[in-house]
């Protein structure tokens, strides 16, 4: 509750009439405009605002250091930039990233390139469903688990070099769908998110690391 109240207080300080019932969305990570899909996220928020006028208010937080841009509003969607390292001592929010993450309803990480992708995994581990893409290693792993829609805690959107517009529209549609879910279905999605995240714990992956290390040793020995 503290996390949510802190985010809502920030939105109000920015002049937004934020309420406890608003949908709070977030994205975070390094300032890599294309690789992290920041460009896609911002355009998706703009289109969501155009499409969802008169519907539930959405406040989207862009928690990315050095990305210092003007906040903007489109319809019922408000985008708030938080251009600082969230280490608990930023002077405004004064909560670490993970302590703020739990206050969100949904996260979006529409990566163009991501070898693995800890941010969507971390989001799900904190019971926050997420949207990612097929160009992240984590997204591919989720697909292998049969989890690709937000009902299952993670929406994995197919992305390539030429379908940016489709990706943006898919994000918008997914958020609209999530907005329409009943509290019971939202709770189910949150439960599914953490259950899938638990499968990605190191204790479950360590056997594969040992196997890969063993193969590497054998190949190295063959060259000696």
Summary of predicted features, one role per range:
Residues 1-224:
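Catalytic cores of carbohydrate-active enzymes across secretory and cytosolic contexts
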């Amino acid at each position: 509750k503290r996390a949510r109240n802190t985010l809502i207080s920030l939105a109000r300080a920015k002049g937004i009439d934020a309420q406890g019932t608003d949908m709070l969305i977030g994205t975070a990570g390094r300032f890599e405009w294309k690789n992290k899909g920041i460009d896609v996220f911002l355009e998706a928020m703009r289109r969501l605002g155009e499409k969802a006028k008169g519907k539930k208010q959405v406040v989207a937080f862009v928690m990315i250091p050095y990305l210092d841009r003007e906040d903007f509003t489109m319809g019922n969607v408000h985008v708030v930039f938080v251009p600082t390292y969230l280490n608990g001592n930023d002077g405004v929010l004064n909560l670490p990233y993970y302590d703020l993450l739990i206050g969100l309803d949904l996260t979006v990480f529409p990566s163009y390139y991501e070898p693995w992708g800890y941010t969507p995994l971390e989001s799900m581990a904190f019971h926050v469903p997420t949207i990612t893409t097929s160009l992240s290693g984590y997204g591919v792993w989720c697909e292998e688990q049969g989890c690709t829609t937000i009902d299952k805690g993670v929406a994995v959107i197919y992305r390539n070099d030429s379908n940016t517009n489709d990706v943006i529209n898919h994000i918008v549609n997914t958020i609209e769908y999530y907005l329409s879910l009943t509290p019971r279905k939202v709770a189910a999605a949150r439960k599914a998110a953490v259950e899938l995240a638990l499968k990605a714990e190191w204790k479950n992956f360590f056997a594969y690391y040992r196997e890969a290390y063993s193969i590497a040793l054998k190949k190295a020995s063959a060259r000696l």
